[in-house]
UniProtKB/Swiss-Prot annotation:
Gene transcribed to yield this protein: IL12B
Any Pfam family: IL12p40_C
Compartments, as annotated in UniProt: Secreted
Organism per entry: Mesocricetus auratus
Glycosylation: residue positions: 125, 135, 223, 315
Protein's name according to its UniProt entry: Interleukin-12 subunit beta
SMART domains xrefs: IGc2
GO CC annotation: extracellular space; membrane
Biological function: Cytokine that can act as a growth factor for activated T and NK cells, enhance the lytic activity of NK/lymphokine-activated killer cells, and stimulate the production of IFN-gamma by resting PBMC. Associates with IL23A to form the IL-23 interleukin, a heterodimeric cytokine which functions in innate and adaptive immunity. IL-23 may constitute with IL-17 an acute response to infection in peripheral tissues. IL-23 binds to a heterodimeric receptor complex composed of IL12RB1 and IL23R, activates the Jak-Stat signaling cascade, stimulates memory rather than naive T-cells and promotes production of pro-inflammatory cytokines. IL-23 induces autoimmune inflammation and thus may be responsible for autoimmune inflammatory diseases and may be important for tumorigenesis.
Signal peptide range: 1-22
Length: 327
């Protein structure tokens, strides 16, 4: 008896949930229709309702068709392909009453499409969004690549709204002036700055930050997700104020300072440094790793000294190199 009740309840949830999942509101008057992209799929039945108290003499038009596509307060569409997506508007007597925009999110062989963004080919898995933080303040930047140059819209937000998640607020996505070339093909680079709403830089991270990026291209919708701890995306800014002081012979003292952006106090948020002397005529560079902000080096004319930084206690990414000539 109990088994029968459980079976009936489970099927009821499935039958009720399936239609609700096929179409959902992305933002005001914009709806995403989830479509099975297999050739024999019937598509999704979508019913649009004109936002008006009027009942008669209502006609519907589409931005893909100059003629009326229907009449009455509701319009039923069988959405199967991109030709069925678009902007649908209801009118009466030449007056626009309301409109609805339909976007398609396609699933092929059980996999949601990822056509808009470039896979940045992480060795372990597909990576579409990459993020970096210059310190432990909870502020970080994410970026992505696309070969598409027009009709794009992006929105990055927290992937969860639950009380035990790490809430994040992201700004508007911006197009970088930098063009990225991969395998001889040029890509547009977009980025967004995000800030964790509540931060405690000295606390141990137990929950990852989760992000979802919603992408629109014309009438196509896709979403991409990523999750990480701030400690895993740390990349310090390079050291600043490099100075050389003569000692004896070719020996010199190289000194530098922590980057302004690095977390304080430095006694707690320590950096370690990689010092390298590069001589054009020698194949091997002289390298040393130090915890302090100075090092004794052998400097000769034509050589270049460079320094980069890394989190002292965690295996973060190294900063960019910053250099000074020996001469």
């Amino acid at each position: 008896m109990c088994h029968q009740k459980l079976t009936i309840s489970w099927f009821a949830v499935v039958l009720l949930a399936s239609p609700l999942m096929a179409i959902w509101e992305l933002e005001k008057d914009v709806y995403v229709v989830e479509v099975d992209w297999s050739p024999d799929a019937a598509g999704e039945r979508v019913v649009l309702t004109c936002d008006t108290s009027e009942e008669d003499d209502i006609i519907w038009t589409s931005d893909k068709n100059s003629e009326a596509v229907g009449s009455g307060k509701t319009l039923t569409i069988q959405v199967k392909e991109f030709s069925n997506a678009g902007q649908y508007t209801c009118h009466k007597g030449g007056k626009t009453l309301s409109h609805s925009r339909l976007l398609l999110h396609k699933k092929e062989n059980g996999i949601w499409s990822t056509d808009i963004l470039k896979d940045q080919k992480d060795p372990k898995n597909k990576t579409f969004l990459k993020c970096e933080a210059a310190n432990y303040s909870g502020r970080f930047t994410c970026w992505w690549l696309t070969a598409i140059s027009t009709d794009l819209k992006f929105n990055v937000k927290s992937s969860s709204s639950s009380s035990d998640s790490r809430a994040v607020t992201c700004g508007a996505a911006s197009l970088s002036a930098e063009k990225v070339t991969v395998d001889r093909k040029d890509y547009q680079k977009y980025s967004v700055a995000c800030q964790e709403d509540i931060t405690c830089p000295t606390a141990e991270e137990t929950l990852p930050i989760g992000l979802v990026m919603e992408a629109q291209h014309k009438y196509k919708y896709e979403n991409y997700s990523t999750g990480f701890f701030i400690r895993d995306i740390i990349k310090p800014d390079p050291p600043k104020n490099l100075q050389l002081k003569p000692l004896r012979g070719s020996q010199m003292e190289l000194s530098w300072e922590y980057p302004d952006s690095w977390s304080t106090p430095h006694s707690y948020f320590s950096l370690k440094f990689h010092v390298q002397v590069h001589r054009k005529r020698e194949r091997k560079d002289e390298s040393q790793f130090v915890d302090k902000t100075s090092a004794t080096i052998r400097c000769s004319k034509g050589a270049e000294v460079r320094v980069r930084a890394q989190d002292h206690y965690y295996n973060s990414s190294w900063s960019r190199w910053v250099s000074v000539p020996c001469s």
